[in-house]
Amino acid sequence: MLTLKLISEETERVIKGLEKKHFKGAKDAVEKVLETDKRRRDAQQKLDKNKQEANSMSKQIGMLMKDGKTQEAEEVKAKVAVYKENDKLLQTQMAEAEQELTTLLCNIPNIPADEVPEGKDANDNVVVKEGGVIPQLPEDALCHWDLCKKFNLIDFDLGVKITGAGFPIYIGKMARLQRALEAFFLEEARKSGYLEVQPPLVVNQASGYGTGQLPDKEGQMYHAEQDDLYLIPTAEVPVTNIFRDVILDEKDLPVMRCAYSACFRREAGSYGKDVRGLNRLHQFDKVEIVRIDKPEHSHESHKKMLEHVEGLLQKLELPYHILLLCGGDMSFTSSICYDFEVWSAAQKRWLEVSSVSNFGNYQANRLKCRYRHAEDKKIELCHTLNGSALALPRIVAAIIENNQTPEGIRVPRVLVPYCGFEMLDDKNF
């Protein structure tokens, strides 16, 4: 969440940033925060003054008793008792203001970085780079869902029978290709310096709150109510929460972690034509990269993450472009975000396969993820960053469509050592 210091010292900048993100009622929300913080500080000042007066009077009681002025001592005791009652009232007022303040802050999104373009939605995002060659397919080229049926690679209907829409079953060589992609992505992350972790697939409320999924995306997450646990929408949540309530040493930055996980999202099924085949699922596999760094180094960290993801797409021989998201299309928590999209040749459209975001200190403030300066031992909030490297379903869709032949689907050369075959076909064994 945004820091009170930022909101109070740079109020106009915060309001303009929230308006750039098309956050409704930006000015009212900020003013409410400042008003509530003033109530909290006023209660604190009154409480401090009240305690000071009570302590001063308490000292008088002993002196009066010593001088034999019992009645006067009792009168002072009565006044001290009133101060103590006032203490309770002021403490309650302060606690209520603090709780209200926390609620207000956690419902205000991060503000965009200066370089984020103005815009309302995805139509206003800016293409900043393109790469690869778009394949020219014959007119009778098939979309990936038809190819999967033709070569017996993915059974969408069987997934519906067992669970429901958005839970496909991968078969034979396709299951092996899934494993190959996961292994390839993790190995490339390791080569880039990321330490692999294998996180839990369910998290508690504190973890969801720490990375900003809660309360913002509560309706999009699967909730195991009996245990009050949430299925993760991305490995970002458990991996970043490793560093919740942690003070890192400056020498240990940047922290670099990667993780493969299944991801679960209830939002699938509400996007019309986007839901066909692998385009949008309830359950999918993804490799996530996470970096935690000093504020002055986070821009460079973001750049390195973008280069890493771009390198993966180049090695997979997929045509891609990189989009700088406009203010209105950014997530609740991000300060700046780039999306990677690959060309799906049969669908003739771009498919998002990665978002790489810098959150500034927004997540770190919720997580209380800090670091200690080496020289003066000052403690400061870290900056957190993460990105998909990569999400599998749409990568698989693009590989299938772009590399189709009458005999099967050509496997990208970089994956052959990981899967052991060069062609995806119905010869599954």
Briefly describe each language-model feature range:
Residues 1-135, 153, 157:
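N-terminal alpha-helical targeting/anchoring segments
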Residues 27, 130-429:
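TRNA-recognition modules of translation machinery and tRNA-sensing kinases, especially anticodon-binding
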